[in-house]
UniProtKB/Swiss-Prot annotation:
CDD domains from the UniProt entry: somatotropin_like
Highest classification ranks of the organism: Eukaryota, Metazoa, Chordata, Craniata, Vertebrata
Protein name in the entry: Somatotropin
Record function comment: Plays an important role in growth control. Its major role in stimulating body growth is to stimulate the liver and other tissues to secrete IGF1. It stimulates both the differentiation and proliferation of myoblasts. It also stimulates amino acid uptake and protein synthesis in muscle and other tissues.
PANTHER family the UniProt entry points to: SOMATOTROPIN, SOMATOTROPIN,PROLACTIN
InterPro entries the UniProt entry points to: 4_helix_cytokine-like_core (IPR009079), Somatotropin (IPR034975), Somatotropin/Prolactin (IPR001400), Somatotropin_CS (IPR018116)
Organism the protein comes from: Giraffa camelopardalis (Giraffe)
Compartment(s) of residence: Secreted
Amino acid sequence: MMAAGPRTSLLLAFALLCLPWTQMVGAFPAMSLSGLFANAVLRAQHLHQLAADTFKEFERTYIPEGQRYSIQNTQVAFCFSETIPAPTGKNEAQQKSDLELLRISLLLIQSWLGPLQFLSRVFSNSLVFGTSDRVYEKLKDLEEGILALMRELEDGTPRAGQILKQTYDKFDTNMRSDDALLKNYGLLSCFRKDLHKTETYLRVMKCRRFGEASCAF
């Protein structure tokens, strides 16, 4: 469960998170680039927190503590997004251009749209995962934000984005099966890792462009 501090911050940002990108970009065409980056970072941070909380609760509920380390070192925990030539941390991300980081972020986001569309069905009977029903919509919203940033940086004429031919498998709804539990555990682990990458890339770009004093992360 999230601590009071992060929960309060998320509540304060609720109005901003609920505002669609189409409204922000269309109704407020004079929005600055810094504003677009700030909104994208906020959305990525929120999604990463949801992914991390869901993973931790799933792990606590279904995976015995003595098995967690060994599972994380098996093929179950392999994320196919690791085959994308993506930076693995802040230092590597700083070597990439903003457009490169945006394109990689878009690939990561799009690889999850299919699986997460049905996430709520997997955890429909569990109060622990009450936020899962809106994860897909939030992910689509972040995708729109990244596309908006790409349009701004490419002078309104973005090149055709690369689409991953392979995406993650769907979550398994048979929660009584050990194989299904391991599969879902691995997927949630990968989702958390990919959202962490996306948040890191967006924060690097925002800090690099606008030189904020609070760029340490």
